[in-house]
Amino acid sequence: MNKPHQRVGSISNAHVGKDFEAVALEIFASRGIYLESDLKLPVGVGEHKKLHAFDLGCEEQMIIVECKCHKWTAPNDNVPSAKLTVWNEAMYYFLVAPQGYRKILFVLRDVSERRQETLAEYYVRTYGHLIPEDVEIWEVDEDGQEVVQQSFNKALHRTSR
């Protein structure tokens, strides 16, 4: 069966995501941050709350993580617009999460040769107005060896009116 939107060489996109979460767990543990999968916390606007399962997290250390293993669309380095809507959804969950939690978007570092920027850099440049100020974005290369960590600071990011 032809599956044009499935990652080449993978069983399924769900497997890609779970494998990426396992890499994230190892990277955080190597930094003394011990997380669990599917941490459920109450989220919502106002008094009405509903449990949301964050990809990774720890109630004791008050950390929540959403993992996204997305790439530029092959073969032409096109923007994966539909996938970035999922990043926007993650930003909303971070916004309505309980106060006091450290919030990390953990993403695959994928560089567009045509644009000369990573997907995360593109996201910050294009959707920076949707990123809460307390969200950190961590990019990891495909082999899990190098992590680029940045805190998002709206004062440094200018958007057009």
Question: Would you name each region that the model predicts?
Answer:
Residues 1-43:
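Acidic-basic catalytic patches of nuclease active cores, encompassing PD-(D/E)XK
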Residues 2-4, 63, 161:
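Conserved catalytic or regulatory cores that recognize and/or transform ribose-phosphate-containing ligands
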Residues 10-15, 19-26, 102, 122-161:
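Charged, structured surface patches that assemble and position nucleic-acid processing machinery
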Residues 27, 39, 49-51, 75, ...:
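Catalytic phosphate/metal-binding cores of nucleic-acid and nucleotide-processing enzymes, i.e., regions
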Residues 39-41, 106-111, 138-143:
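Acidic carboxylate-rich catalytic motifs and surrounding loops in phosphoryl-/glycosyl-chemistry enzymes
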Residues 42-49, 112-114:
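Acidic-and-aromatic substrate-binding clefts and catalytic sites of carbohydrate-active enzymes
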Residues 52-70:
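Active-site beta-strand-loop-beta-strand hairpin of nuclease catalytic cores
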Residues 68-126:
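Catalytic cores of nucleic-acid endonucleases
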